[in-house]
Amino acid sequence: MNLPRGHRTPLQAVICIALAFCLLVLAGQSANAQFYVRSPDVKKGQIAIEEHGAVYFGPGEEERRRQSHELELKYGIAERWEFIVEGFLREDIGESLEAREFEIGGQYEIVERHGDGLGLAFRGIYEFALQNREPDEILFGPLAKFVRGPDSATINTFFIGQVGPHREIDSLELKVNWRLKHEFNEKWALGVEGYGEIEDLSHAGRWDDQKHRLGPVAYLELEREGSNLEWEFAVGTLFGISDATSDVTLKFDAEVKF
């Protein structure tokens, strides 16, 4: 599906969203999660379908999971605006895999990066809870990426507030995702990723009460010559560095852009 940008229409965006829903239903049989560092870059007319998965080993005191899965669809509706639809599934220990959230929102590119330098964006997402007696949530925060030659540093800082009658906290949750990456060539790269989560900023507690993990990740990028079709893959091992976190998390990402 590699149409010239000038021929892409809102109808095609709707078709892609429908495709994402179909994939989300099928994904109920796989093992996936959302440990992924997002880029601030926005490209008008580009459609991206992403799958972010994880499998957990050695349950933590506050995290007792088997697997989780996130499917994300993005569409560049303007030079700096991006429309986002997401779905999230999770399987806890002793439970079955369940659809947990449906999410919709957007991203605005504040500072556009050209080659080396800084890129900056802001993302906002409304997360609809799909399970009874769980609160809806609003996620918002900045994304930044700095590039110098083959090296780059990316950080996402997201705040999450609960809304609705089933709120469990009145404060905000904080999630910080970061990545240091070195590209060896146009296809291969290695990096280190880290993920931190404080579930209630008004009662942050000790380090071991929070969820923190980091580890090495390998990246592969493929581009179809003569077309706009791009594939990106990543696989890594994240080690829990707090008592609340699972000992080991195997993460994998797959993304197609056109």
Where are these regions (language model features)?
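Short, low-complexity intrinsically disordered segments enriched in A/P/G/S/L with frequent Arg
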Residues: 9-10
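Transmembrane beta-barrel domains of Gram-negative outer membranes and organellar outer membranes
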Residues: 31-258
